[in-house]
């Protein structure tokens, strides 16, 4: 706004008469919370383009609508290294925007709704994330991973599939750090329901998982062609194979 800023600076509690481009210093008994607005006013309300700066260094610069953050803008809080650039509505992140934590490298780039991740977006996790996650890219609902998305870990593991309220849930494909792949059903972040484990050595096993454990009758198909049945109970294998030479079992497997 530069030279267009009025020379008049307000210090009292009333902004009723402010019009056009003005500077207003908000009164406070605590200097720590002092804030200054420089920008456009309409009928005593911040409206148009303007900058609000707090004593602690926090700054909002962008569009206003009747005293609320609304439209395109940026918010920077230097004490914590947080910076947001994007759309606002009713003083909240709303629409498309990027939120960055500069101190640890965390960043969300995508859609927002009332201050929460909502829609499609990519979250890059902290450099020192305790769960060793690198990123999640996909759908969100009210701040949680929800819908279809991909998550990757530093170990090389990756999950691609459905999520519900932040957890793997429904149909999905998990690639493990050793190269094995599991395709099947998930519930509450655990393998639960029909699935197939593709081992890196070429072997395959088809069956049902319960609470992340193999449970029930499995078909184990070796890479060289031999097929046998195996019985698991809560992840524990029966001592002996149930049968060998199960060539009559269809090799076609479809997991919905």
Where are these regions (language model features)?
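Intrinsically disordered, low-complexity repeat tracts enriched in Gly/Pro/Ser/Thr and acidic residues
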Residues: 1-256
């Amino acid at each position: 706004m530069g030279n267009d800023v009025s020379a008049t600076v307000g210090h009292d509690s009333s902004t009723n008469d402010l019009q056009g481009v003005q500077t207003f210093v908000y009164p406070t008994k605590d200097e720590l919370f002092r804030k200054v607005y420089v920008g456009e006013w309409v009928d005593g309300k911040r409206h148009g383009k303007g900058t609000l700066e707090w004593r602690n260094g926090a700054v909002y610069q962008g569009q206003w609508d009747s005293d609320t953050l609304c439209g395109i803008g940026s918010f920077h809080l230097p004490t914590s290294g947080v910076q947001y650039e994007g759309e606002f509505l009713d003083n909240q992140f709303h629409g498309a925007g990027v939120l960055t934590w500069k101190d640890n490298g965390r960043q969300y780039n995508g859609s927002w709704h009332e201050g929460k991740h909502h829609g499609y977006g990519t979250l890059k996790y902290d450099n020192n994330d305790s769960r060793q996650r690198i990123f999640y890219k996909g759908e969100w609902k009210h701040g949680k991973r929800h819908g279809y998305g991909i998550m990757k870990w530093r170990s090389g593991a990756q999950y691609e599939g459905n999520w519900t309220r932040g957890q793997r849930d429904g149909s999905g494909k998990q690639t493990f750090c050793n190269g094995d792949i599991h395709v099947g059903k998930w519930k509450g972040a655990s393998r639960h329901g029909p699935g197939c484990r593709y081992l890196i050595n070429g072997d395959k096993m088809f069956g049902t998982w319960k609470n992340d454990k193999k449970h029930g009758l499995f078909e184990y198909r070796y890479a060289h062609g031999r097929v046998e049945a195996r019985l698991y109970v809560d992840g524990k294998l029966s001592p002996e194979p149930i049968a060998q030479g199960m060539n009559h079992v269809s090799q076609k497997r479809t997991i919905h």
